[in-house]
Regions:
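A short helix->loop->beta-strand "cap" motif at the edges of active sites that frequently abuts
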Residues: 73-75, 250-255
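Conserved beta-strand signature within the Rossmann-like core of class I S-adenosyl-L-methionine
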Residues: 224-226, 254-261
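Class I SAM-dependent methyltransferase Rossmann-like catalytic core
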Residues: 1-48, 61-69, 88-91
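Conserved Class I S-adenosyl-L-methionine
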Residues: 267-291
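A short glycine-rich, Lys/Arg-flanked "PGG" loop and its adjoining helix->strand segment in the class I
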Residues: 237-253
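The AdoMet/dcAdoMet-binding core of the Class I SAM-like
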Residues: 45-219, 226, 241, 283, ...
Length: 367
């Protein structure tokens, strides 16, 4: 797994550390928990036929969690990620097992141990049939090369992969994959495949390319968009106003975009692109992300006056990528220059003024 280090997150699901970005792919409190809390639980799914655009598919947690939670729907997933390897490894990643021994050992790794927070263990799950569906569609897209046995068989990584699914693919290999499209022949291997999937249409389309190029080629609209790119300072390419405007054009009038970030830049970018924007609040009443839609009714937790004011400071100035082809460095430098030349109030000054207003209000109330 060149460039990636697997580790156990706080809910005992597997996350990845990127050596390129020196950052984690998944929240330290739980990769699977994050997928459910930020990309599944905020959505009220009423339609029976659904189209999902998953930007930065990675290990597939968001789409897998959504499918697992919506078993009786017909769903088409369009999955975008520049890294084909992660796509192909996605069905084999462990999500349902406690790996406490490995959690204790990884504390010695200073690259990612600081991110991991052992929190409340929640029984979110990904059932095996979801991964079997992924295996089927990955094979149909990439052929036999989707099965990266050189990585899956390495001893150092074996604790992070589902051995039963690896063995399942090896069995299919021996049969020349001739049974991979025949659910009735899989019945003796996995009853749940027949039970859940024989009467439904589930489709995964994979686009292993720069998401900026892919979104310009898509000619359909979506009910849900998952925006799960690296943070803005690491991957500004997928947070620019120009990219977000493309997403606005790809989403249905009643569609919903969800993302993990609470960033002032991104919330203002979404608003400038035409979205109504609100907050995602988890069951612990913590703000864990941002929700956006063309339909104001879809927003349950609006931004308050203070948060809206903060968007109008220098902190809210968007990233710009006019051709959707610039490097991260170019985009960051362009925004830096725009911020320096802007006459808008700085966020630090705005926060200070707001704090002083609160202090004055409290003082007046005491009189």
């Amino acid at each position: 797994m060149d460039g990636f280090l697997p580790y156990i997150t706080g809910d005992d699901s597997v996350g990845l550390y990127s050596e390129e970005f020196h950052d984690i792919y998944h929240s330290g409190y739980g990769a699977l928990t994050e997928a459910y809390e930020k990309f599944v639980c905020p959505l009220i799914v009423e339609k029976d036929n659904i189209n999902v655009l998953d930007i930065c598919f990675g290990l597939g947690y968001n789409s897998k969690a959504f499918l697992n939670a919506n078993k009786n729907k017909k769903i088409i997933f369009d999955c975008l990620d520049i890294n084909k390897t992660l796509m192909c490894l996605s069905p084999f990643i462990k999500t349902n097992h406690r790996l406490c021994d490995y959690f204790r050992k990884q504390k010695d790794n200073d690259k990612y141990s600081k991110y991991v927070r052992k929190g409340k263990y929640k029984k979110y799950r990904i059932e095996d049939w979801v991964n079997i569906v992924l295996i089927k569609h990955l094979y149909e897209k990439f052929g036999e090369e989707f099965f990266m046995e050189d990585i899956l068989s390495q001893n150092q990584f074996s604790p992070f992969f589902e051995q039963n699914l690896i063995n399942f693919v090896k069995f299919l290999q021996k049969r020349g994959y001739k049974d991979i499209g025949s659910p009735q022949k899989w019945l003796f291997l996995h009853n749940i495949y027949y039970r859940y999937l024989s009467k439904r249409d589930i489709l995964f389309n994979f686009y292993p390319d720069d998401a900026r190029r892919t979104v310009q080629k898509l000619n359909k609209t979506y009910d849900y968009i998952f925006l799960d790119a690296f943070t803005t300072d690491k991957c500004p390419q997928l947070w620019s106003i120009d990219f977000i405007k493309h997403l606005y054009n790809l989403i249905l009038p009643d569609g919903v975009l969800v993302t993990y970030t609470n960033s002032v830049i991104i919330r203002n970018t979404l608003i400038e692109a035409g979205f109504f924007v609100g907050k995602i609040i988890n069951e612990d009443k913590k703000f864990v992300g941002t929700i956006a839609s063309k339909d104001k009714i879809k927003i349950k937790n609006y931004l308050n006056e203070y948060e809206l004011g903060l968007l109008k400071t220098k902190a809210g100035i968007p990233y710009r990528d006019f051709t959707l082809a610039d490097s991260a460095e170019q985009i960051l430098e362009r925004r830096k220059s725009e911020v320096e030349q802007s006459n808008l109030m700085s966020s630090s000054r705005y926060i200070k003024l707001h704090s002083n207003k609160i202090k004055k209000r409290c003082s007046d109330n005491e009189l």
